[in-house]
Amino acid sequence: MSHRAIWRESIARRKYAIVFEDDAVIRGDVRDVLPPLVSQLADNWDIILLGYNTNSILDLKLSDGGIDFRGHFSVQYPTLVQLSAFVASKEAVEIYKLNGAFGLCGYAISPRGAERLISTCFPMDKRVIPIPALGRSIVSSGLDSILNAFFRQVSAYACFTPLVVPINDPSSSSVLQA
């Protein structure tokens, strides 16, 4: 099922949805950790990234004073050993306002968020998207890149440390590259 189809289902049922892509590696404690994090936000959130690709940037808002975290991961493509350790991890997780990230390996979306993102992301096109954490703009190549144009405009959040990471193996990816 496509992301957009899941979003439409969320809207139709007026229910929140949690989405995991087929290459998602999920921490073993996600069921214990996620509900208290979400409850911190009350009901005014659109999307919460539970994880993101480790081969690109993560850009989080730390304060209203303009202090952001912009970083890269030490391992772009985790090994199976590293992914196994991740599943067993019990590192502290907090939730932050999201400015930018790539990858949709795992996320929660509200019906309101689904409506807002469907109306802003589709139809998908080759729009130019500024990525401040990269210091440049990119031409969108998929839904996760298009979302970067809207994370700052909607109530988007991300878990850090992540609760989900993708296998993200470029040799077996089903994502078409130009």
Question: Model-found features: residue ranges?
Answer:
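An acidic/histidine-cluster motif and surrounding catalytic segment
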Residues: M1-F20, A24-A178
